[in-house]
């Protein structure tokens, strides 16, 4: 089978939104070439367990590559993707050039090329994220491994927002806690919470592909006795109370449910949010405070923030 590689040149701010647009358009896989990976702070702190080739990354901006089977409707699909991306500035998301290029790739190249972007990464004092196809031996008994197979559909679990969420969970999760993960994606945050001692984790995503991916990764990490995965829109119809909610979503989506989060998380419980570009920190903090939360801590990495807030 022939595949088309759709490359979109954009900004780091727009990565999650553009990736979501591509998934919704039916991409069978997405790879992200971000030059920030070459100089990330965590390389000094923890050390990525591989060497990156600068020649494979754009000089500026971010290149997002998505893979679609070649069909008669591909041109319409690309036009729809472009239209959706062009709308993002109306949500204050800078898209950069937004240039789109198309290349043909063979199935055998498509099936393996994306794996070069994904290697074991130690993202905190506790966790190392390891792809299923690589062998890795923990450096200490305390080191916890999260195995992920993104299935060509979701990220590697090493984006700054995911890293900060996991570090926030390390700071806050207590043995026996009950947790909800909103917009679970690959399920990485739910798996981390389970490995930190949570007794029950409910993981939700609106995207059925995400639900399938999360279920697979939860089983892979042998946390399916703790983590349940389901399809749901944010916190609609979800009852509490739970000890903690974690949501790694775009700021614009987080703004849709602070009141629901305050309803579902118990009094004194925590709401961890990320996916927030630094410029949106103030508006998110104000929305959380309006819903009754107190901001306890803000984590920062590159141009992103994560917020730990406590319910009244």
UniProtKB/Swiss-Prot annotation:
Binding-site positions, S-adenosyl-L-methionine: 162, 183, 205, 248
Principal location: cytoplasm
Listed EC numbers: 2.1.1.-
Cystine residue pairs: none
Compartment(s): Cytoplasm
PANTHER family linked: ELECTRON TRANSFER FLAVOPROTEIN BETA SUBUNIT LYSINE METHYLTRANSFERASE (PTHR43648:SF1)
Identification of the protein by name: Ribosomal protein L11 methyltransferase
Enzymatic reactions: L-lysyl-[protein] + 3 S-adenosyl-L-methionine = N(6),N(6),N(6)-trimethyl-L-lysyl-[protein] + 3 S-adenosyl-L-homocysteine + 3 H(+)
Stretch forming the signal peptide: none
UniProt GO cellular component terms: cytoplasm
A GO MF term: protein-lysine N-methyltransferase activity
Described purpose of this protein according to its UniProt entry: Methylates ribosomal protein L11.
Organism annotation: Bacillus cereus (strain AH187)
GO biological process, one term: methylation
Alphabetical UniProt keywords: Cytoplasm, Methyltransferase, S-adenosyl-L-methionine, Transferase
Keyword S-adenosyl-L-methionine: yes
Family stated for the protein in its record: Belongs to the methyltransferase superfamily. PrmA family.
Protein's gene: prmA
